[in-house]
């Protein structure tokens, strides 16, 4: 009975939080931190008691008092239907408002710590995305593509349907309809000269016996609420291993994906690039 009541309360609270306007949202987290943070006085008393009497029981009391009540609140919110997704969306909203509130900045960091446990790589599921993948997932691939915009369903089909094009995504078991990150791969004969060769709609398909190169040409993080958690390296390693198992002739792995921040850096250096004198022989 208590567990059921707890779930009902958590569901009700989650719905209330979603309905708050921005100022109410900020005030809610101010109140949570004020009422459910660590009881410093009780913790200090317990610490003093432990210094006098170093028992396992006293150490456990310190451990219990060191955990703030709001952390248990997040755990309970995580138990409701789609609770994990709702918490990810909650952190996304926190991040959008955190410049207006020091307490939201605190909860942004605190949720990140929890998420790093909940989204441990060992919990993630690698799935292949192709033209037969359900439409609701494909729509999100179009929306979340962050490197080379997908302009139409024909454009998407050209990236997913041919046998020499692959796409893989990580999912979390509690967010089965939400990709966390995905990578697009072209299987080619040697490295292509340009990205346009890779993503154009009408092109010849590389036959299986001619494939020797895997070109990772786009990788996109999908969830702003999981910002700060690195999935990319783990995804690429898993995909490279899987592709190698499926393609005996594959011996080169390259990337055409843009370097994050490179364009901004280049803009700042452009005047130097154009005005610097040519080096003398």
Predicted regions and their residues:
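Conserved acetyl-CoA-binding loop-helix of GNAT-fold acetyltransferases
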Residues: 228-241
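Conserved small/polar residues in nucleotide/adenosyl-binding loops
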Residues: 1-5, 274-281
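N-terminal low-complexity, Ser/Thr- and acidic-residue-enriched intrinsically disordered segments
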Residues: 3-145
């Amino acid at each position: 009975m208590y567990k059921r009541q707890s779930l009902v309360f958590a569901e009700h609270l989650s719905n209330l939080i979603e309905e708050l306007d921005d100022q109410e949202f900020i005030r809610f987290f101010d109140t949570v931190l004020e009422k459910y943070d660590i009881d410093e006085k009780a913790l200090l008393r317990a610490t003093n008691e432990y210094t006098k009497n170093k028992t396992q029981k006293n150490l456990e009391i310190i451990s219990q008092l060191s955990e703030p009540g709001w952390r248990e609140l997040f755990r309970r919110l995580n138990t409701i239907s789609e609770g994990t997704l709702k918490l990810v969306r909650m952190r996304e909203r926190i991040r959008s408002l955190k410049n207006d509130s020091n307490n939201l900045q605190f909860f942004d960091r605190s949720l990140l710590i929890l998420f790093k446990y909940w989204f441990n790589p060992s919990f993630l599921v690698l799935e292949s995305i192709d033209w037969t993948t359900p439409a609701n997932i494909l729509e999100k691939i179009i929306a979340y593509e962050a490197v080379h915009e997908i302009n139409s369903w024909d454009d998407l089909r050209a990236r997913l349907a041919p046998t020499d094009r692959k796409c893989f995504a990580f999912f979390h078991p509690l967010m089965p309809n939400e990709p966390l990150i995905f990578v697009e791969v072209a299987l080619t004969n040697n490295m292509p000269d340009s990205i346009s060769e890779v993503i154009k709609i009408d092109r010849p398909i590389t036959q299986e016996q001619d494939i020797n190169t895997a070109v990772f040409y786009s990788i996109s993080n999908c969830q702003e609420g999981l910002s700060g958690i690195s999935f990319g390296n783990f995804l690429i390693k898993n995909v490279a291993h899987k592709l190698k198992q499926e393609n005996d002739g594959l011996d080169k792995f390259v990337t055409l994906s843009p370097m994050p921040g490179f364009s901004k850096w280049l803009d700042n250096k452009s005047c130097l690039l154009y005005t610097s004198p040519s080096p003398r022989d």
